Amino acid sequence: MQNKFLICDDCQGVNCKSLEKKLTKLDPEAEIEIGCQSYCGPGRRKTFAFVNNRPLAALTEDELMEKVEKQLQKPRDHEEEERLRKRNEERKRRKEEQDRKLKEKLAQRKHK
């Protein structure tokens, strides 16, 4: 089964371009999805990536890559990955809902 990496192009702690290059070098066949991962809290202070739906974070990109390599060596549990995928989707959905409500409130304040 193909590995999948999810990285954020919005968080302060993530250098998307260099991280994407390192992940591609590590596994050229992996699918890499770039976009908001709704992992903003840790993403302010740490670099992170989701590896097969499992979040991994570290203070530096090199430390993160060590964790990614270790994670890729572990046997994959497809049921666990599916559970994590659903959890990640729900987290993104909740963040989108919060953002939508905030925009509505701001729009209402402008019209007053």
Swiss-Prot record:
Q: What is this protein called?
A: UPF0741 protein SSP2119
Entry's HAMAP family? UPF0741
Coiled-coil region(s) at which residues? 75-112
**Region annotation Disordered: residue ranges?**
68-112
Keywords of the record: Coiled coil
Specify whether Transcription is a keyword of the entry: no
Family note: Belongs to the UPF0741 family.
UniProt entry tagged with the keyword tRNA-binding: no
Q: Which domain of life is it from?
A: Bacteria
The record's section on InterPro entries has: UPF0741 (IPR020880)
